[in-house]
UniProtKB/Swiss-Prot annotation:
The keyword Metal-binding applies. This is Monomethylamine corrinoid protein 2. GO terms for biological process: homocysteine metabolic process; methanogenesis; tetrahydrofolate metabolic process. GO terms for molecular function: cobalamin binding; cobalt ion binding; methionine synthase activity. It comes from Methanosarcina mazei (strain ATCC BAA-159 / DSM 3647 / Goe1 / Go1 / JCM 11833 / OCM 88) (Methanosarcina frisia). The keyword Repeat applies. Can form a complex with MtmB. SMART domains: B12-binding_2. GO terms for cellular component: cytosol. It comes from the Archaea. Residues 1-91 form the B12-binding N-terminal domain. Pathway: One-carbon metabolism; methanogenesis from methylamine. Belongs to the methylamine corrinoid protein family.
Amino acid sequence: MTNTEIFNKLTNAIVTQDIAGCAKLTQEALDAGISPLDIITKGLSPGMKIIGDKFEAAEIFLPQIMMSGKAMSSAMEILTPELEKTKVEGEEGTGLAITFVAEGDIHDIGHRLVTTMLGANGFDILDLGVDVLNETVIEEAAKRKGQKIILVGSALMTTSMLGQKDLMDRLREENLRDSVKCMFGGAPVSDKWIDEIGADATAENAAEAAKVALNVMK
């Protein structure tokens, strides 16, 4: 198979919730000399984008999301050790990434991928998990005031995305906004939304998220 064929098959494995097939293809891609980063950005992430768009359009529902998540996890179990081997040591003081999925949202597929990529690019990680209250994010940021921090929030649903605006408002109320950078992602998040709520950045996929985060923290 050509690399393009492998990437297309990986994308399809995510979309069709083929857990065993996704793991097998991931190993085959590594054996063919394809980098973990390319496997993620050109094979797995496009599949997750399709899944996110289908969920937003109500074409699929939670069970399918969960199964696609398991397919992604089967791939990441293979890729994470490889990413660790090639971990980029960030410049001194790259910073701490506090990652979380918005309150009311338990879809952690993209979140886990972004967290992995941030760690692989030199960030220290504090992963708060899924269905995280804005109050919890505020508390964790306040504890570390004075450190270099970027908040990285995910939301797959429009309803949970709206909580990002509340978080930005709370950061300003608590005089924490100037202490942290804020990046949000997920299927419904757009550049227009980021501008509207006064956040710093968004990204199309996990690999881009790591690059954007590094740029924002300069």
